[in-house]
Every structure is written in C-alpha cells, then in structure tokens.
A protein has these predicted regions:
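Beta-strand-turn-beta hairpins that frame and shape the catalytic cleft
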Residues: 1-5, 106-113, 178
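Core catalytic region of metal-dependent phosphoesterases/phosphodiesterases
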Residues: 3-7, 13-80
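Active-site-proximal beta-strand elements of phosphoester/diester hydrolases
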Residues: 4-11, 112-118, 183-184
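Divalent metal-coordination and catalytic microenvironments
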Residues: 9, 38, 53, 63-64, ...
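Active-site environment of divalent metal-dependent phosphoester hydrolases
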Residues: 11-15, 41-43, 67-70, 121-122, ...
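Glycine-rich phosphate-binding loop signature in dinucleotide/nucleotide-binding domains
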Residues: 24-30, 107-109, 159-161
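Active-site neighborhood of divalent metal-dependent phosphoester bond hydrolases
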Residues: 46-150
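Acidic, His/Gly-rich catalytic cores of divalent-metal-dependent hydrolytic chemistry
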Residues: 125, 130-234
C-alpha cells in the first residue's frame, strides 16, 4: 500500500535526500513524497534537488527561502549573496515550481497539515499572516509569534490540534515532538541530519514521543553552511 513520506528542510542536499529515500525503501510511483519547504539556498545542489522532486512527483509547501526568492523574482526585494547565487541560475520551469508551492498542504487521510514553520493556535490557517506560516518559531502568552528562538515558548507547545501539524524551519539537533505538532528540521545543511516521517496509508500521526518509531534519519555528508555547529549549537 502507498505510504506518505514527509521530509524536513533539504536545502539542496540532494545526496542526503536520495540516501534517506533509499533507507526508507521509497517506492517510486507508489509512495508519496511531501517536503516541508526550503528545498533551496545554503546547500550544494539547486538544480538537482528540483529535478529529483519533479521526477518523484513530490509535493512541497513553500518555505521562507522560496518566498524570498519569489519576492526578488517579482521585483519586490533585493537579495543577499546566498539567495542571489540561486536566483540567477533558476530556469523558467524552476521558477514555476516555486510559484506553485502552497503555504500549507492538508493530508486528510492522516488528519495532518504540512506547513513550513508553524501555525498560530486558535487562528484559522487561512486567516494567519503568511509570515507566521513561513517564519515563526515561538509564541508568547498573548499569542504574538516570533522568529526569535528566545522570544517565548515553542509554538508547538501551545498548539492543541487537530489537525496534527508537520513542519520544519527551526533547525535543531533532534526533531520537535509535541502532542499535536512534529518538527522535522534537523539541520542537514549545517552538518546535522535529514529526517523523514514515514506514514502507512491512512495512518494517523501518533502524538508526542509515540511518533518516534516512524522517524528515520540520515547524517549529512558534511556541513555545507554556517560556522561550527551552525544553529544546532544553540
């Protein structure tokens, strides 16, 4: 039966994604691949990761790095050097891939929702600001969200579902395992790991630590970006 494989922030680490899919026994043409965004920037392989995603029929939500690239593409904002190196080599077809990425993706068969960074508890997702979905890490007792790691509790600690939210964005040494939210960004591009959540057909996501047996990871081939440990040293 078809499975759903949800993978954390890839950042151009094509080799690690291929290794991870081999490890989980991904069945091309049968299993479904879902990506939490930030396919590009900081890592080594811009064209390769997009070609692999296209070949496998992957679905990806939009990450903050795709959003930044698209803002430049529509002549709204300038870019720094990391993004400029990517933006200047993307083809028309690759830009269309980025344009097609939604801010969130619902997986009703798993009672799950995939978003890049997070959701605001108590706020309907179609009423939430795009910035929150793309960048939030924490949220305070007033419901004010922030991209700063020390601005309040992790948003997942305050979210009470349903649906279960699967997200990325905040690179940490280990996955975030909250009751109703699972964070998969384990910092592959910084020399950490690339992590997948593997679900059987129609399988709901277990809550909290119970999800751990469904998580599979591979170690980065090397650090591609940042200083010693990058954000994983926090």
């Amino acid at each position: 039966m078809a499975r759903t494989v949800i993978v954390g922030d890839v950042h151009g680490c094509t080799g690690e994604l291929e290794e991870l899919l081999e490890r989980v026994g991904f069945a091309e043409g049968t299993d479904r691949l879902v990506l939490v965004g930030d396919l590009l920037v900081r890592g080594p392989d811009t064209h390769g990761i997009l070609a692999l995603a296209r070949r496998l029929g992957a679905r990806s939500v939009r990450g903050n790095h795709e959003e930044k690239l698209l803002a430049w593409h529509h002549r709204r904002k300038p870019l720094g050097p990391d993004h400029d190196r990517v933006a200047t080599v993307l083809s028309d077809d690759e830009w269309r891939m980025l344009e097609a990425m939604p801010l969130w993706l619902d997986l009703p068969e798993h009672d799950a929702r995939v978003v890049h960074a997070g959701v605001i508890p108590g706020v309907a997702i179609d009423r939430a600001p795009a910035g929150a979905l793309l960048k939030m890490r924490t949220i305070d007792e007033r419901g004010d969200w922030s991209d700063e790691a020390d601005a309040g509790p992790l948003w997942g600690t305050r979210y009470t579902g349903p649906p279960h939210v699967v997200f990325g964005h905040y690179a940490r040494a280990e996955p975030q395992l909250h009751a109703w939210a699972t964070g998969l960004d384990t910092g592959c591009v910084y020399g950490g790991k690339l992590t997948a959540l593997v679900l059987d057909a129609d399988e709901p996501i277990p809550r909290g630590e119970a999800v751990r047996p469904l998580l599979k990871s591979v170690t980065a081939l090397r650090p591609y970006y940042g200083g010693k440990g990058g954000p994983l040293s926090r």
